[in-house]
Regions:
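Conserved structural elements of the adenylate-forming
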Residues: 37-43, 149-153, 184-205, 267-271, ...
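Conserved ATP/PPi-binding loop(s) of AMP-dependent carboxylate-activating enzymes
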Residues: 336-340, 352-382, 418-420, 424
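Conserved beta-loop-beta connector loops within the AMP-binding
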Residues: 312, 344-363, 397-400, 470, ...
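Gly/Ser/Thr-rich phosphate-binding loop
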Residues: 143-147, 257-261, 271-330, 342
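AMP-binding/adenylate-forming catalytic core of the ANL superfamily
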Residues: 105, 260, 366, 371-372, ...
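Conserved AMP-binding/adenylate-forming core of the ANL superfamily
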Residues: 21-68, 72, 89-94, 147-148, ...
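Conserved AMP-binding/adenylation subdomain of ANL enzymes
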Residues: 192-209, 217-258, 273
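Conserved pre-ATP/AMP-binding loop-to-beta segment of ANL
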Residues: 17-20, 130-173, 179-180, 200-209
Length: 516
């Protein structure tokens, strides 16, 4: 796969030039045809080639027509789009800008005003609205040419970058949930391989549209809801935020969205606010980023009438690793690996390979596995050996090829020599609170974290934003058969459980709250 992502997008858009490929629900349902999107991307790409000398370009835009055009223009021009996390705070964005050597950022005036003081600061800011007005005539010409010229001729005429293969195509910074963000380099080969793997899982379902509300700085938002539609996947219906379940329910119902990719946290909020009337038309729902609680899966099937398919991915995997297929799912697992990917489990301490069915640290090898962290050969060497990526997750592969994730290493505490999983305790507490009617908004309101303990090494701490009596919670956990060593002894009431824009729990912020 030596092809470039830019050429793949050009071909995918030119082939459907007269069809609507993006509906921007955040802009009143504006419908963007593939040819128009391609024309704007080609015009802006020419501008970037002329005026931006550096390789990487920062982008601060939400999901929508603007975000799609800015990212498309970068890959057409041979630039690396770096979608900056504008929700992570000044320190994290400054770190990303410094590591990537970003001098220019593409955004919009409204976006800068919304982000305010946390807006990433660079030498130069390009307003997308102004750029598109200035390049309007060229964009129209290119959109017309997209209707009449063969893709190869169009690419040659527009001087579209053909660099591909193992060259850098995207740069995503980890959420920083466990520390300073790391730059994950994704090559053209990585992204295109994962797109083909996604097609292999979902291509036969005849999906006409998917919801694109995950941030573009999130790996699923970047690959699944940005590049998949542009390279030939289903139409994407965009909304600028995943945090508004009421609006998202309206969007899903109004535009008859077929595919929803989200996190369990956001799905629970959506189920509570939208209901069957708006969500019942979905053909498939896939969750990732955190374990899907069995109670949520059952409740969604009962109330909405749709089976939730749990999947699994990571930024270093471009990101899709495994997913439960429609009609061939196994509850409690994340499904089978995507095509071309290998997995093995190893002992954490020795690195010894374990037998199939035995739980251990998961390692993956395949065309969608990243080549390394930006400017950090030390970190890269720790996690990549002979093409095998040493993940931070515990799991096991059964005899039928279904993968089960036991939890992230960062979500375990070593207490009295035993590894205690935070996620299992959270699942018990969330299920209990939900059935007791104490959960207010639909999102998870409990987080288990840990602080240092001189006697046992670590002490579990429960952060909760809803009413909870510690003694009552301890009794409930014991009645559910939770081992005594796993039962937390400290409970801290907080205003809200810290959650990242990606829908994951903010582990670093949680530890700070617990230690405070």
């Amino acid at each position: 796969m030596s092809e470039s992502l830019g050429i793949a997008c050009l071909r995918g858009l030119a082939r459907r030039a007269s069809r609507v490929v993006l509906v921007d629900a955040g802009m009143g349902g504006r419908k963007i045809k593939a040819g128009v999107l391609l024309g704007a991307g080609l015009a802006l790409a020419g501008r970037l080639r002329r005026e931006v000398s550096e390789r990487r370009v920062g982008i601060v835009l939400p999901p929508g027509a603007g975000g799609a055009i800015a990212n498309l223009a970068c890959v057409l021009a041979g630039k690396t789009p770096v979608n900056l996390n504008f929700t992570s705070g000044r320190a994290a964005s400054e770190s990303a800008i410094r590591q990537a050597g970003i001098r220019t950022v593409i955004s919009a005036k409204a976006m800068e005003e919304k982000v305010g003081e946390h807006f990433p600061q660079t030498e130069r800011k390009l307003d997308l609205g102004v750029l598109l007005k200035e390049e309007k005539r060229k964009a129209i010409v290119w959109s017309v040419l997209a209707l009449i010229l063969p893709a190869k001729v169009l690419a040659w005429a527009a001087n579209v970058s053909t660099a591909g293969g193992d060259d850098e195509a995207g740069l995503l910074f980890t959420s920083g949930s466990t520390g300073e963000p790391k730059g994950v380099v994704l090559t053209h080969r990585n992204i295109l391989a994962n797109l083909r793997q996604i097609d292999g899982v979902l291509g036969d379902l005849e999906l006409k549209s998917l919801l694109g509300c995950l941030p573009l700085f999130h790996s699923f938002g970047f690959t699944v809801t940005l590049w998949w539609p542009l390279t030939g996947g289903p139409q994407v219906v965009t909304y600028p935020s995943p945090l508004d379940p009421q609006a998202l329910g309206e969007v899903i119902g109004k535009y008859t969205v077929d595919l929803l990719v989200t996190t369990p946290t956001f799905l629970r909020m959506l189920m509570k606010r939208a209901g069957r009337e708006k969500l019942g038309g979905l053909k498939m729902v896939v969750t990732g980023a955190e374990k899907l609680p069995a109670a949520l899966r059952e409740e969604f099937a009962q109330k909405i009438g749709i089976t939730v398919h749990e999947g699994y991915g990571m930024t270093e995997g471009s990101p899709v690793i495994a997913v439960n297929r429609a009609g061939a799912e196994r509850a409690g697992t994340v499904g089978k690996l995507v095509e071309g990917l290998e997995v093995r489990t190893v002992e954490e301490e020795t690195g010894k390979e374990l037998n199939r069915g035995e739980a251990g640290i998961l390692e993956f090898r395949g065309p969608n596995i990243f080549p390394g962290y930006l400017g950090r050969p030390d970190l890269t060497e720790k996690v990549l050996q002979d093409g095998w990526y040493h993940s931070a997750d515990f799991g096991r592969l059964d005899e039928d090829g279904f993968l089960t994730i036991e939890g992230r290493r960062a979500r375990f505490s070593k207490i009295g020599g035993e590894m205690v999983p935070h996620g299992v305790i959270e699942e018990h507490l969330n299920e209990w609170l939900d059935r007791a009617g104490r959960v207010r908004g639909g999102g998870y309101e409990v987080m288990v974290t840990a602080v240092e303990d001189e006697r046992k090494g670590e002490m579990l701490v429960v952060l909760h934003s809803c009413p909870m009596d510690g003694i009552e919670a301890e009794r409930e956990l014991r009645e559910r058969g939770v081992p005594n060593l796993w039962i937390p002894k400290k409970f801290v009431r907080v205003g809200s459980v810290p959650i990242l824009a990606s829908g994951k729990l903010d582990l670093a912020a949680g530890r700070k709250l617990a230690g405070g």
